[in-house]
Every structure is written in C-alpha cells, then in structure tokens.
Amino acid sequence: MKLNKKRKTLFVAVLMFLFLSLLAGCGGKKTEEADTERPEYIYVPEYFNLGNSDYIGSAINYENEVFYYTEAWDDETGKSRTGISKYNFESRKSEMISLDVGEASVSAMQITPDGKIALLIYEWTNTEDENGEYQDGSGSYALWYMDPESGEITGQKELSEENGVAKDAYLGSFYIDAQGNNYLFNSSDPCIYVLSGDLQMVAAISLSDYINQMFASKDGEIYVTLYGNTGTEIRKIDLTKKALSDPLKFDKELMNINGCMTGISCDFLVNDQNTVYAADVTAGTFTKLFDWLDADVNGNNVNYFGELPDGRIWVITSTYDGNNNEAELLLLEKKKSSEVAQKEEVTLGTLWLDDNVKSAIIDFNKSSDKYHISVKTYGQDDWESGLTQFNADVASGSGPDLVDFSNLNYTLYAEKGVFEDLYPYMEKSGLKKENYVENVLEAYEMDGKLYGFTTEFSIYTIVGKQSVLGELSGWTLSEMMDFIDQHKDSEVFPYASQQYMLYLLVYNNMDEFIDWESGKCSFDGPEFARILEYTKTLPEQYNDCLLYTSDAADDSLRV
C-alpha cells in the first residue's frame, strides 16, 4: 500500500529527525569511515519530469533520443489521449509526435535495422447483433513503421493467420534481430513467432511455459528470461534449432531479474530491482554497475531503462501517489566520486527493505545536500545468515547507524544497550512528546527511555448493537468471555473461524498469559480454557459462500 502525501511527508520528517539526531551523537566519526569506503565511480542522476500519464506502454532509445508511448485520460473530451513523445538528450527538449491510431493502441515499439520505429498496433473490434447488442468481439494486430524524425507512418502490415499468427493470439513482447526478423511472443498459447522482415513465417517456437521478458543484445541476438528451478533463467533463441538454448551460465545467480535491456558497452543490462549489472555472455559475467538506491531511484518503480551511445543510462519511472500517476525520466551519468559534492554517510541496517522506507530514504537523499543514507540489507539472500551477520556487526561495533527493526525483536537489543534513548534528541530538536500519540511512543519505551519510533499504527476495534451493549466502551478478556456465555444463542463474532478467533484472542491478550518481567507463561488457567471452549464452537473454516445462502446467520441473532 502506498503512503499518501501527508503520511509520506511525516515519514521523511521522522527519518530526517532520526538521521540528524544520530549524527549529533556520532560526532562525525562515521563520516571519516564512509569517505574511505566511497567507490571510485558513482552514477549521478539528472531528472526530467514527464508530467501526468495514466500509462507508459513502451519506451526505446535510438541514438541520443528516447521514444515513449503514453496514454492519459482527457477530462475535457472524455477520451483517452495517446501519442508518442521523444526526448533528445543533446538539445534537452521533448517533442510530441502526432500519432492517430483511432481506437487502437501501441503494444510495443522497436527499432528496425534501417532506423525506422516499428510499432506493434493492437485493435479490438466489437460486433453487434441485429438488435444493436454487443456480441463477442475480436482483436487484430499490425506492424506500423514510423520515421523517427518526421513521425510519418511509412508503412503498415497486418498480422494474421496468413502470416502464421493464430487468430486468438495475444501478442505482448516484440523484438527485432540484426537481420530484421520479428520476434513476437504469444501468451494465449505460449510460443514465439519469428517472422521475416516481409512477415513470412521463419519459425514458431513452442514453449512449455510463459516467459517473463524478451530482449535483444547489442549484436542483435534475441534472448528470453523465464523462471527455472534455481531462479530466473536467461536463454537464447536459437533459430537454427528453432528452440530455446540451455540456460546461460553466469558468475552470479540472480533470483529475481526484473528486466534486461540492450547494451552499448556490454551485451545487455540486467536489473534485479536493487542493482544494475552489465552482462558479458562470452565471459559469463555479471559486472555490477550501481545500486538503484545509491542513484536515488526506487528500483520497484523502474518501467524502462537503457544505455545511450556515450554510456549514460536513461531510466523511466512511474510513481502513483494515490491520486495521479507521475512519470519521470532520469539520466544517470557515471562520474568519479572525487568530482561529486561529498555528503556525510549514514547507514540504515535492515533484514528486508520495505518499499515505503525505500521511497522515504530516496526523498530524504534528494532533499538533503549534506547527508546521504545508504542501506545495508542483511537478509536479502538468506534470512538466517543475514541475522547472524547483523548480530556480529552489532557485537563488533561495526553495525549500522540506524536499524529498521520491523523484522527484529528490538527489546533484545535495547536491553543490551545497543540503541540510543531518543527522548533527549527529541527535546533538543524541539519535538514534543505531547504532540504525538503518547501511548504509542510508550510502546517503544523501556525503563522510561525511547528506543524506537514508528511512523504509523493501526487500531482494531469491535462494534455492536447499543441495545445490547449499552454505554460499554471497552472490556477485559474476562468481561468479553462473560458476555459470550450470556449470549450463547447469538452470533457475537460473525464470519470467524476457530483458528482466526484463537489467534485474535490470544495475540491481543498476551499480557493475560505472559509475565514479561519474569518470562513465565501461564496457558493452563481458566481464562485460556474459556477461550479454547469458545473457539471450539466456531466452524473450523469459515465459508464465505454462506453469506449468500439461507444458512447464513439471521441479522437478528447478531449482537
């Protein structure tokens, strides 16, 4: 779930408070260490806002220009507005190319060997009976060819059964190899159609499963990614054998490949949502170029990316803020660290980086000209070994400056004096405890010291009929069980299964059964027995279908 703007602003403010407070406590020591650890080169982002767009359907680069297809709803006309835009990185100007596709849409774009832009056009046609009622429609595909300078459509070719394309085909991925052959993935009956430049069938390669993506290397060879036994596999399309090759072997095993794009300085670029690698097929290597987060980019929001002739990386991201979808074009330039303004480094340690935290860190890094937050994700590859490494770092004094303990038992570390008390820093920064929900802060207290700060919390409550509950505003576990005993013929908690209700009652009443000071547990008393007796009266598994049948509980029985 995305944070709305108000919550996101609060999140960044809280992070900034924590970061600045910590730096005051560290006395700058971390900065000296971070300077020695800076890499020789970093990728520096430059931003170009593309405005509001409901959908960016495809993007490619040709020489120093990026072309992208957009769809956006026009409130004035009540219709979807479509078009192809291009951004020139030399002139720093964007231009909208007029494209009239009628009721159709652009599914994909590619560059032909002669420098034209090939557009895969999809159109759905509804049919009507004699009464004007819509019947089952049908879809059709065509390839249009556009001049990248003038925007003129220079040719149109239909794709149909005459070309060997199935009538019910659903074409998604589309690429063109160095010889001008067209590769089209049909997801309705998994196969790859290979058509010549004049759209004659070259091969129809049947697949046992779906592919994730199709892409081209810098020499025009076509590859696919798909899920295998050990993670995401990369395979080459072998036209000689009319089949996929065996999985390519690389020196790194990437479990999640989120996208591959044609390279200029390498065979192709690989994105695993966290890091971008340069692939060398012959050497079998993935060479790390940069982490998205270090370039102030949320890798989860990357739609398209590629490499320009001069080695710069272009990226298109899309972010939804709850109301609008905002697209942004970035240009990442490789620079020596010594040429870039130095920032004080602060490290956040986490077992798994939540997307909201990631976005907040990026916003902070963009807004601060003095500090930069880097992230060390301990549990990315293996949870247990990551936790072991985290504990070792903390014990040796080389742990992170900040800790995201969403997946940690923070009390174990607080008891050992690992964390700073945040109250003095709040007071020094002018943040008053009474401006927050104090009992939420107190949940992260230990012996009157604040060891954690949450950015949000949820409240679970129960509502019932006032005629039955009266002015009751709350109850203890014992009072609730008394109420259930007094209303055995009523449905106190509808739609609850045994397992769900047992979890709910025990989880929310742990203090009844556990003495947190001594660690003593008491699950053999009368209150716990009453919970077991009550949950046993509930169905083992609740059937949602009962909501719509005569077997559903009558509303008059509910309290």
Protein language model regions, located:
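Surface-exposed loop and turn segments in beta-propeller and other repeat-based domains
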Residues: L99-G102, Q156-K167, L293-A295
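Conserved small/polar residues in nucleotide/adenosyl-binding loops
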Residues: Y548-D555
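Hinge/lid segment of periplasmic solute-binding proteins
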Residues: L408-T461, W475-E479
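Bacterial N-terminal signal peptides
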Residues: A13-S21
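Helix-loop-helix "hinge/cap" segment bordering the ligand-binding cleft or interdomain interface
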Residues: N88, D147, G151, E445-L546
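Conserved N-terminal structural module of periplasmic/extracytoplasmic solute-binding proteins
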Residues: G27-S85, F89-R92, E103, S107-Q110, ...
